[in-house]
C-alpha cells in the first residue's frame, strides 16, 4: 500500500478509506440495509490485511452500533497506533434536548460517547457531519479546538458544507488560533460533480484534504445499469433517489456515463 498525507498534515492514510455506514445493527435505525457484526468483521479484516488503515464512521450510523462494531474489529485485527479512526457528529442520536447539533454541550457529550463505543481514548479525525445553523459557528469551532487540546481528538474535519461556509470556518479558525479543519468530506463522483465548481478549488488553495463520500453513487456506478436495483441496499435506499435521478427516469445520456 502506498500511503499519502491527509491534506497538508503529516498524517499517513491509505488512499482508499473504509466507510463504515454499511456496518451496524440493522435493527437500530438508519441504515436498515446495514450488515451485522458477523458479516462486517471479515470485510474489516480484509481491509486491514490489504494495507488499508483509514476507517470512517459516525455516531448516528445504526444508532452507534457502527462505531461499536468497527471498534471491536479494529481492536481484534490491528494495533491502535497503526490505524486512523474517523467519526462524525451533528445528526440526532437520541430524542430530547441536546441530542443533536454542534453546541458545546453536544460536542463534549458526543465525543465521550463515541470514544466509549469505539473502545479508544482518542479519535484521529473528528468531523462535523453538517453545519448546525442553530448554534453560533464560533461556539462550535472553539469546542472542537478544546477537544484537540484535551487530547481526545488529533485532527478536525468537516463534511458537506457550502464552500462559502467552509471558507468562513477556516477564516475564523485562523483568526482565533484554533485548530483548523484539515479535511472536507464531500459528495463527489461521476454523477455528482458540483464540488468541482468551488469546494475542491477552495480545498486545494487552503491545503485541505478531500475525502469523498458515495464515490460509487450509492451503487449506481458499481454494477451493470440493469442490475442497479438488484441488492438489498439499493432496493431500500430511498436517499439515493433524492441524490440522483431515480433509475426509472434516467435518460440514455445519463446511463452512458455509467
Regions found by a protein language model. Name each.
Residues 1-83, 149, 217:
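N-terminal binding-site loop/beta-alpha segment at the start of enzyme catalytic domains
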Residues 33-47, 101-118, 166-171:
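Short, acidic/polar
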Residues 49, 73-84, 115-119, 148, ...:
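Acidic (Asp/Glu)-rich catalytic clusters
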Residues 6, 18, 40, 47, ...:
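Conserved, mostly hydrophobic/aromatic
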Residues 24-38, 93-108, 129-135:
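Active-site mouth loops of central-metabolism enzymes
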Residues 14-15, 80-83, 87, 121-125, ...:
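Short acidic capping loops at alpha-helix termini that bridge into adjacent secondary structure
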Residues 94-127, 187, 191-194:
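Active-site gating/metal-coordination segments in enzymes
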Residues 3, 131, 135-258:
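Beta/alpha (TIM)-barrel catalytic core signal, keyed to glycine-rich beta->alpha loops juxtaposed to Asp/Glu
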Amino acid at each position: 500500500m502506498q500511503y499519502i498525507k491527509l491534506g497538508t498534515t503529516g498524517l499517513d492514510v491509505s488512499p482508499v478509506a473504509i466507510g463504515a455506514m454499511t456496518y451496524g445493527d440493522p435493527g437500530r435505525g438508519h441504515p436498515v440495509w446495514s450488515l451485522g457484526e458477523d458479516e462486517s468483521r471479515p470485510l474489516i479484516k480484509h481491509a486491514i490485511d490489504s494495507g488499508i488503515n483509514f476507517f470512517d464512521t459516525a455516531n448516528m450510523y445504526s444508532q452507534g452500533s457502527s462505531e461499536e462494531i468497527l471498534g471491536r474489529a479494529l481492536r481484534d485485527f490491528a494495533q491502535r497506533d497503526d490505524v486512523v479512526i474517523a467519526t462524525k457528529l451533528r445528526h440526532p442520536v437520541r430524542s430530547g434536548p441536546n441530542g443533536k447539533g454542534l453546541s458545546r454541550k453536544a460536542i463534549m457529550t458526543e465525543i465521550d460517547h463515541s470514544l466509549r463505543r469505539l473502545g479508544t481514548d482518542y479519535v484521529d479525525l473528528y468531523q462535523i457531519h453538517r453545519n448546525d445553523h442553530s448554534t453560533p459557528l464560533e461556539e462550535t469551532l472553539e469546542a472542537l479546538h478544546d477537544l484537540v487540546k484535551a487530547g481526545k481528538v488529533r485532527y478536525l474535519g468537516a463534511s458537506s458544507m457550502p464552500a462559502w461556509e467552509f471558507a468562513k470556518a477556516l477564516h475564523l479558525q485562523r483568526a482565533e488560533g484554533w485548530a483548523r479543519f484539515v479535511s472536507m468530506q464531500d459528495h463527489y463522483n461521476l454523477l455528482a460533480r458540483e464540488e468541482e465548481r468551488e469546494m475542491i478549488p477552495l480545498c486545494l488553495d487552503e491545503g485541505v484534504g478531500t475525502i469523498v463520500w458515495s464515490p460509487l453513487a450509492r451503487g449506481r456506478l458499481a454494477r451493470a445499469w440493469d442490475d442497479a436495483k438488484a441488492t438489498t441496499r439499493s432496493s431500500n435506499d430511498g436517499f439515493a433517489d433524492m441524490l440522483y435521478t431515480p433509475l426509472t427516469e434516467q435518460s440514455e445520456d445519463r446511463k452512458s456515463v455509467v
